[in-house]
Protein backbone atom coordinates (compact mmCIF):
# COMPACT_ATOMS: atom_id res chain seq x y z
CA UNK A 1 0.00 0.00 0.00
CA UNK A 2 1.30 3.42 -0.97
CA UNK A 3 1.50 6.32 1.48
CA UNK A 4 0.02 9.27 -0.41
CA UNK A 5 1.14 12.15 1.81
CA UNK A 6 4.76 12.04 0.58
CA UNK A 7 6.19 13.37 -2.68
CA UNK A 8 8.89 11.68 -4.79
CA UNK A 9 11.57 13.15 -2.50
CA UNK A 10 9.94 11.72 0.62
CA UNK A 11 8.70 15.09 1.84
CA UNK A 12 5.23 15.80 3.15
CA UNK A 13 2.60 17.02 0.73
CA UNK A 14 -1.12 17.55 0.58
CA UNK A 15 -2.65 14.94 -1.73
CA UNK A 16 -3.84 16.30 -5.09
CA UNK A 17 -7.60 15.70 -5.46
CA UNK A 18 -8.47 17.96 -8.41
CA UNK A 19 -9.30 15.08 -10.75
CA UNK A 20 -11.22 13.02 -8.18
CA UNK A 21 -14.97 12.65 -8.51
CA UNK A 22 -17.22 14.33 -5.97
CA UNK A 23 -19.31 11.83 -4.04
CA UNK A 24 -21.32 11.84 -0.83
CA UNK A 25 -18.88 11.05 1.98
CA UNK A 26 -19.82 10.01 5.50
CA UNK A 27 -17.84 8.89 8.51
CA UNK A 28 -18.83 7.82 12.00
CA UNK A 29 -16.30 7.80 14.85
CA UNK A 30 -16.67 7.03 18.54
CA UNK A 31 -14.74 7.26 21.79
CA UNK A 32 -15.29 7.02 25.52
CA UNK A 33 -14.49 8.82 28.72
CA UNK A 34 -14.60 6.97 32.02
CA UNK A 35 -14.93 8.60 35.41
CA UNK A 36 -16.11 7.98 38.93
CA UNK A 37 -19.85 7.22 39.16
CA UNK A 38 -20.34 10.37 41.28
CA UNK A 39 -18.83 12.50 38.51
CA UNK A 40 -21.13 10.99 35.90
CA UNK A 41 -24.08 11.67 38.19
CA UNK A 42 -23.10 15.35 38.45
CA UNK A 43 -22.99 15.60 34.66
CA UNK A 44 -26.35 13.89 34.18
CA UNK A 45 -27.99 16.00 36.91
CA UNK A 46 -26.53 19.16 35.32
CA UNK A 47 -24.85 20.15 38.57
CA UNK A 48 -21.44 21.05 37.13
CA UNK A 49 -20.47 24.68 37.85
CA UNK A 50 -19.39 25.38 34.25
CA UNK A 51 -22.82 24.49 32.84
CA UNK A 52 -24.50 21.74 30.82
CA UNK A 53 -21.50 19.54 30.07
CA UNK A 54 -23.01 17.46 27.28
CA UNK A 55 -24.54 20.45 25.47
CA UNK A 56 -21.23 22.34 25.51
CA UNK A 57 -19.28 19.21 24.46
CA UNK A 58 -21.71 18.65 21.59
CA UNK A 59 -21.15 22.17 20.24
CA UNK A 60 -17.38 21.83 20.72
CA UNK A 61 -17.37 18.61 18.68
CA UNK A 62 -19.28 20.26 15.84
CA UNK A 63 -16.89 23.22 15.86
CA UNK A 64 -13.89 20.87 15.85
CA UNK A 65 -15.14 18.96 12.81
CA UNK A 66 -15.35 22.27 10.94
CA UNK A 67 -11.77 23.20 11.96
CA UNK A 68 -10.07 19.88 11.17
CA UNK A 69 -8.28 21.28 8.11
CA UNK A 70 -6.70 23.91 10.37
CA UNK A 71 -5.57 21.34 12.96
CA UNK A 72 -4.32 18.36 10.94
CA UNK A 73 -1.58 19.53 8.54
CA UNK A 74 -2.38 17.43 5.46
CA UNK A 75 -6.19 17.49 5.72
CA UNK A 76 -8.05 19.37 3.03
CA UNK A 77 -10.44 22.08 4.23
CA UNK A 78 -13.90 20.68 3.50
CA UNK A 79 -17.38 22.12 3.13
CA UNK A 80 -19.19 19.85 5.54
CA UNK A 81 -22.90 19.37 4.97
CA UNK A 82 -23.68 17.82 8.34
CA UNK A 83 -22.18 17.05 11.74
CA UNK A 84 -24.04 15.27 14.54
CA UNK A 85 -22.71 14.40 17.98
CA UNK A 86 -24.57 11.89 20.13
CA UNK A 87 -23.98 10.39 23.56
CA UNK A 88 -24.62 6.99 25.10
CA UNK A 89 -24.45 6.82 28.89
CA UNK A 90 -22.97 3.54 30.10
CA UNK A 91 -23.80 3.41 33.80
CA UNK A 92 -22.05 3.48 36.17
CA UNK A 93 -19.02 5.37 34.85
CA UNK A 94 -18.76 5.94 31.08
CA UNK A 95 -19.94 8.34 28.41
CA UNK A 96 -19.56 7.22 24.80
CA UNK A 97 -19.55 9.99 22.21
CA UNK A 98 -20.26 9.40 18.52
CA UNK A 99 -19.75 11.82 15.66
CA UNK A 100 -21.32 11.47 12.23
CA UNK A 101 -19.92 13.80 9.57
CA UNK A 102 -21.15 14.22 6.00
CA UNK A 103 -20.07 16.15 2.92
CA UNK A 104 -20.21 16.05 -0.85
CA UNK A 105 -16.60 16.19 -1.87
CA UNK A 106 -13.44 14.72 -3.34
CA UNK A 107 -11.95 13.41 -0.12
CA UNK A 108 -13.27 11.60 2.93
CA UNK A 109 -14.41 12.95 6.29
CA UNK A 110 -12.83 10.34 8.57
CA UNK A 111 -10.45 12.83 10.17
CA UNK A 112 -13.31 15.27 10.76
CA UNK A 113 -15.29 12.58 12.60
CA UNK A 114 -12.27 11.50 14.66
CA UNK A 115 -11.42 15.12 15.51
CA UNK A 116 -15.03 15.82 16.49
CA UNK A 117 -15.11 12.87 18.89
CA UNK A 118 -11.72 13.75 20.37
CA UNK A 119 -12.65 17.37 21.08
CA UNK A 120 -16.07 16.33 22.40
CA UNK A 121 -14.39 14.09 24.97
CA UNK A 122 -11.69 16.65 25.77
CA UNK A 123 -14.41 19.21 26.44
CA UNK A 124 -16.14 16.86 28.87
CA UNK A 125 -12.80 16.43 30.64
CA UNK A 126 -12.21 20.19 30.73
CA UNK A 127 -15.62 20.95 32.16
CA UNK A 128 -15.37 18.49 35.06
CA UNK A 129 -11.64 18.38 35.79
CA UNK A 130 -12.21 20.48 38.93
CA UNK A 131 -14.23 17.55 40.29
CA UNK A 132 -12.07 14.70 38.96
CA UNK A 133 -8.70 14.70 37.27
CA UNK A 134 -8.41 10.91 36.89
CA UNK A 135 -10.88 10.55 34.02
CA UNK A 136 -9.66 8.45 31.09
CA UNK A 137 -10.34 9.20 27.42
CA UNK A 138 -10.02 5.99 25.42
CA UNK A 139 -11.00 3.85 22.49
CA UNK A 140 -11.25 6.62 19.89
CA UNK A 141 -11.87 4.85 16.59
CA UNK A 142 -13.46 5.05 13.17
CA UNK A 143 -16.64 2.95 13.09
CA UNK A 144 -17.58 3.39 9.46
CA UNK A 145 -17.08 5.42 6.34
CA UNK A 146 -18.86 5.56 3.00
CA UNK A 147 -18.11 7.08 -0.39
CA UNK A 148 -15.01 7.55 -2.45
CA UNK A 149 -12.77 5.36 -4.56
CA UNK A 150 -11.64 3.16 -1.66
CA UNK A 151 -15.24 2.12 -0.98
CA UNK A 152 -17.09 1.60 2.24
CA UNK A 153 -15.63 0.51 5.58
CA UNK A 154 -17.37 -0.83 8.66
CA UNK A 155 -15.46 -1.78 11.83
CA UNK A 156 -16.19 -5.23 13.21
CA UNK A 157 -16.76 -4.68 16.94
Curated annotation (Swiss-Prot):
Pfam families from the UniProt entry: MoaC
Active site: 126
Segment forming the signal sequence: none
Source organism (scientific name): Carboxydothermus hydrogenoformans (strain ATCC BAA-161 / DSM 6008 / Z-2901)
Subunit structure: Homohexamer; trimer of dimers.
Entry keyword set: Lyase, Molybdenum cofactor biosynthesis
Catalytically driven reaction(s): (8S)-3',8-cyclo-7,8-dihydroguanosine 5'-triphosphate = cyclic pyranopterin phosphate + diphosphate
NCBIfam families (alphabetical): moaC, PRK09364.1
InterPro entries from the UniProt entry: MoaC, MoaC_bact/euk, MoaC_sf, MoCo_biosynth_MoaA/MoaC, Mopterin_CF_biosynth-C_dom
Function statement: Catalyzes the conversion of (8S)-3',8-cyclo-7,8-dihydroguanosine 5'-triphosphate to cyclic pyranopterin monophosphate (cPMP).
EC number: 4.6.1.17
Taxonomic lineage of the native organism: Bacteria, Bacillati, Bacillota, Clostridia, Thermoanaerobacterales
Protein name as it appears in the record: Cyclic pyranopterin monophosphate synthase
Disulphide-bridged cysteine pairs: none
GO molecular function, one term: cyclic pyranopterin monophosphate synthase activity
Binding site residues for substrate: 74-76, 111-112
Family: Belongs to the MoaC family.
Gene Ontology BP term (one): Mo-molybdopterin cofactor biosynthetic process
Pathway membership, UniProt: Cofactor biosynthesis; molybdopterin biosynthesis
Keyword Lyase: yes
Amino acid sequence: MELTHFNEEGRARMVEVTEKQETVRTAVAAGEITMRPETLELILDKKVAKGDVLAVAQVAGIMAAKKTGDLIPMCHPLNLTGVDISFTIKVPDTIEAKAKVTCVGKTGVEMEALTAVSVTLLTIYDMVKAVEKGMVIKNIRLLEKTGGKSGDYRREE
